[in-house]
Amino acid sequence: MVIKVVLLIVFFAIMIGVGVYTRKAATDVNGFVLGGRSVGPWLTAFAYGTSYFSAVVFVGYAGQFGYKYGLSDTWIGIGNAVIGSLLAWLVLGRRTRVMSKHLNSATMPDFFGKRYHSNAIRIAAALIAFIFLIPYTSSVYNGLSRLFGMAFDIPYSVCVIAMAVLTGVYVILGGYMATAVNDFIQGIIMLIGIVAVIVGVLNGNGGFIEAYKTLSQMESDVAVTEGLQGAFVSFFGPDPVNLLGVVILTSLGTWGLPQMVQKFYAIKDERSIKTGTIISTFFAFVIAGGCYFLGGFARLVDVTEITVNGSLAYDAVIPSMLSKLPDILIGVVVVLVLSASMSTLSSLVLTSSSILTLDLIKGSISKNMNEKKQLFVMRVLIVFFIVLSVVLALDPPTFIAQLMGISWGALAGAFLAPLAYGLYWKGVTRAGVWAGFVAGVGITVANIFAKWTSPINAGAISMIAGLVVVPLVSFITPKLEKGEIDFSFKCYDKKPVIEKKIALPEDLVAEEK
């Protein structure tokens, strides 16, 4: 117990210390929201990765999908690395950075408003982000509480409040730069922690070969492959179709999430994007691949906890796997998941507060608000969002994965297509953007009431629908003015200026002497 407490105290002290150290970088709106657009590739890549993977992934998704799909759930981690990180950086990174700087936009709704020359689109995007980021923030705590309850036997409410207060302190002090530096530290902890945990769990089950053999002898209880042995160690698992839905939601979804795309706004230059792409992809392979690989052995643990609906409590799977580890490893796990959760929470509340302040309050209500007042309002809203997320977390309405599925589906379904097409194609119309918003949010919300499929599949469908609807509607609706389009895209015509030192000929140098 002493080891675990010491690790936590040191961790908390470092987080607060970083907030104090970086407070000088948060003296204006640009510094507070984007770190002055001067954040290096390492900090940006780690900020992207740690915002991507939280306790939702480690406890919620890894436990649930590892139990359902066995080792084939590792495909989710591979998809996260290839589609959610590598392709996201290659396709969106440079163009998002260049166009957002050209349009002087600090948030995704502001980008939409300026790219499509529509204040109504900006306000609608801000409202969608405001409404659907909340379920994600509340879900971050839930996974953490399971591990804290296992390690320290302390009440859930204490876990939630302590984490919220600590996150709020360093975000309010240092803004984006505090989150970026802390994300880097937390990312290092996550990399070390996930490797140590996998080794510890496999050793506790007789090593990889023995664990694999035991898993291969289990009969599938999934309808598609019911009764078959070896389904949980097969290439695509017992239920490939639903597995594909999870891969699409968790991988392609990052392309449309405001808190993820914002990382491209803040990176300092185009050269840094190349370095960041490599780092971010490696980070995702280790963290996501490791989490889902670990979850693939979930059936080796006897989980008896049942929900009120009579189904297995998937949120208890990973904590049960870890409960027999030595104290030092449990301490590492707690700090690992705390790191993942705090980094995601800090990114979410900073994104939410900046969108509400810059796009709704300053953009529509108090247009003459000065920078000092904007900073004050953002800090107040950070407190508001954290308190709201705590209230929701203390009475969670559904499973971690379902909460995440609702928010990811609505946000990515609404924003992915208007963003991706808007960066490359001059033909996107305002009507096409509105159609994307309606399709993304409409499918997700309709499924909440109709329950015709799982929130995971509904989220994946909403993203694909947006990618289809936006171009179709754009083909048959009035185009933007040529001047409006040319203004947005002329940023790509600019060539980076490279300073070249020219050496004087030797005879001129001699003559000068």
Residue ranges and their predicted role:
Residues 1-513:
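Membrane-embedded helix-loop-helix hairpins and adjacent transmembrane boundary segments
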